[in-house]
């Protein structure tokens, strides 16, 4: 990645156990039932010699072990394995039949019980979300929202991915009115074209010429599905999607560079490289917009790239090393 300046900022690491740590199927299977038995068997009769006691206390039979098979709620296979394990234990240890039979009945009843969890209500989620925003933010900061009612004058234009995990307002703590944000698959900026991808062109034009933003940021992120698609879709031949393949090929030069320089590298590592290189391609594409070049030449606009790694909780920011000169006539 060719950069004039680059720095990495460590940010607090927020770990989501449900998304970052998943048990594998193999580990789930092996952990379905774990029971360890220690059995001491001896034959005795009324005429047998009493056992020699370590302590002068009566000898009682060891209590039956507590057997607690575990299974996951998202499939029947683990449940069936738990039952099979109990049945196998019955064959080997017949004296535990009452305990195992009770546990089988309990497991079966729990598996058959209806799910009491309330179904997700999207309308209620939207309503409660707005109520929370209004009571905690809108009502508590009237000066800000009174000012926003008069208009907007953001300093930043941000291109970010549509991925639900990388909202720039949360990641960079943007407040309302601070950033004019465009989100699309893989945070890409296509070259200037009046007839194709006009939605992006309109956003850039509005941000630069009307809002007078001072910075344009293009921010990539870790584990981007759009970039993985770019790296795995065939460069030629029929498409398997209606829109996605054409769109991500906006940054095909990034893929070509990564493959040429890191051929043989594992796909996951290539994707990380391409996530950043695609940002550089988008920054280069911004230079094809005449009003962007004018802003750079007049020092009223700057372009920067970034990469948010939500796995490790880091953020990188850089500026491309490029120069613009005024045209000359011959």
Swiss-Prot record:
Record-annotated membrane-spanning stretches: none
EC number(s) per entry: 4.2.1.1
Superkingdom of this protein's organism: Eukaryota
Keywords, ordered alphabetically: Cytoplasm, Lyase, Zinc
One CC-aspect GO term: cytoplasm
Catalytic activity field: hydrogencarbonate + H(+) = CO2 + H2O
Coiled-coil region list: none
GO MF annotation list: carbonate dehydratase activity; zinc ion binding
EC category name: lyase
GO biological process terms held by the UniProt record: carbon utilization
Region described as Chloroplast transit peptide-like: spans on this chain: 1-109
Subcellular location, record wording: Cytoplasm
Recorded domain comment: Possesses a transit-like peptide, but it is proposed that this peptide is not removed and that therefore the enzyme stays in the cytoplasm instead of going to the chloroplast.
Family that this chain belongs to: Belongs to the beta-class carbonic anhydrase family.
Function summary: Reversible hydration of carbon dioxide.
UniProt protein name: Carbonic anhydrase
Species assigned in the record: Flaveria brownii (Brown's yellowtops)
């Amino acid at each position: 990645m060719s950069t004039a300046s680059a720095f990495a900022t460590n940010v607090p690491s927020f770990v989501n156990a449900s998304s970052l740590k998943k048990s594998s199927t193999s580990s789930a299977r092996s952990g379905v039932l774990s029971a360890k038995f220690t059995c001491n068997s001896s034959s005795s009769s009324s005429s047998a010699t009493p056992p020699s006691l370590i302590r002068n206390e009566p000898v009682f039979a060891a209590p039956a072990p507590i057997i607690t098979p575990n299974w996951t709620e998202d499939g029947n296979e683990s449940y069936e394995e738990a039952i099979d394990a109990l049945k196998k234990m019955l064959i080997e240890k017949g004296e535990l039949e009452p305990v195992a039979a009770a546990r089988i009945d309990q497991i079966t009843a729990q598996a058959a019980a209806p799910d009491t969890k309330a179904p997700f209500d999207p309308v209620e989620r939207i309503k409660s979300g707005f109520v929370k925003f209004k009571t905690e933010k809108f009502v508590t900061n009237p000066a800000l929202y009174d000012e926003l009612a008069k208009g907007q004058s953001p300093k930043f234009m941000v291109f970010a991915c549509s991925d639900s995990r990388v909202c720039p307002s949360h990641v960079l703590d943007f407040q309302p009115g601070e950033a004019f944000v465009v989100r699309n698959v893989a945070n890409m900026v296509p070259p200037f074209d009046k007839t194709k991808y006009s939605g992006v062109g309109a956003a850039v034009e509005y941000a630069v010429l009307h809002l007078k933003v001072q910075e344009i940021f293009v921010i990539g992120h870790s584990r981007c599905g759009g970039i993985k698609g770019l790296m795995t879709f065939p460069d030629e031949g029929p498409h398997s999607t209606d829109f996605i393949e054409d769109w991500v090929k906006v940054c095909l030069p990034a893929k070509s560079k990564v493959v040429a320089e890191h051929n043989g590298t594992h796909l996951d590592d290539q994707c990380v490289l391409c996530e950043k290189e695609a940002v550089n391609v988008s920054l280069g594409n911004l230079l094809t917009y005449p009003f962007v070049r004018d802003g750079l030449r007049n020092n009223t606009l700057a372009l920067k790239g970034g990469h948010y790694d939500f796995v490790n909780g880091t953020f990188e920011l850089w500026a491309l090393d490029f120069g613009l000169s005024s045209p000359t006539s011959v």
